[in-house]
Amino acid sequence: MPDVSSIFEKREYIRQFAINNNYDGFFQIDDDVEYVAFSIENSTPRKTSGAYITYKCDFNMMLNRVIEKSIEHDAALASVTQYENVCWRKPHEVSVNSKLNFAQFVYITTDKIKDISYDTSGEINEDLDILIRLLQHGRKAICVCDYGFKINNKAIHNIATSTLYDNSLDKYYKFILNTSAKYHPTLWVKNGRLRTRYHYKKYFNTTELPPIDDKILDMCKNGQANELIDYLIKQKEK
């Protein structure tokens, strides 16, 4: 850990880390919400129009995935694999005609980052400690805040799409479709089948959903969360 104690010092450490290493660093979207993004692939500067950002993911869930690999943070953070190579998009870039911009990331998220400037709780300090440790392990992280938006006049929060990896043996797509505070499924595609955890299980009594088709992939890529859910339920009922 760097020799810093206050939240402000830790925040500045992260900011300077981004600047010194030619990462995107902090940038402002809303007046009171600040985001930070670090690109693993920093050999070519990324265009600002291709911001890879997601909004308000469950920080504790992400953190638990990391910590469960080891009791010691350092060992755990060094072995993060679940959330590698992730790509996110801005809300206004989500449309039926938009194409995904893929890049490689490891990310850790929190909806508390916007409170760092004036919140002195130990929880915030711990979050920043973890973020700094990620950076010191050579991981580049994305910290994001709460944000919601609409598609087709339906409130859809935290839609994100990503490619985790694509090699000769397997294609693995993961995307989060959070349609409400009560409904937070995680879906992914592996070996040609759409798989899921959390709330989808109560609808389908299984974590393995119907084989994916072009329509499913299109809805995933276009962020059509509600349409996808309806389609999957109908497919399951056949």
Residue ranges and their predicted role:
Residues 1-29, 34-48:
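Active-site-proximal specificity loops/subdomain of glycosyltransferases
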Residues 12-16, 94-95, 204:
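Short, surface-exposed amphipathic charged segments that create phosphate/polyanion-binding patches used
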Residues 20-21, 72-73, 137, 182:
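Alpha-helix C-cap/termination motif
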Residues 25-29, 76-81, 141-145, 188-190:
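A structural signal for short, well-ordered beta-strand segments and their strand-loop junctions
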Residues 32, 84, 148-149:
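Conserved beta-strand edge residues that scaffold enzyme active sites
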Residues 35-129, 136:
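Conserved catalytic core of nucleotide-sugar-dependent glycosyltransferases
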Residues 122-238:
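C-terminal catalytic/acceptor-binding lobe
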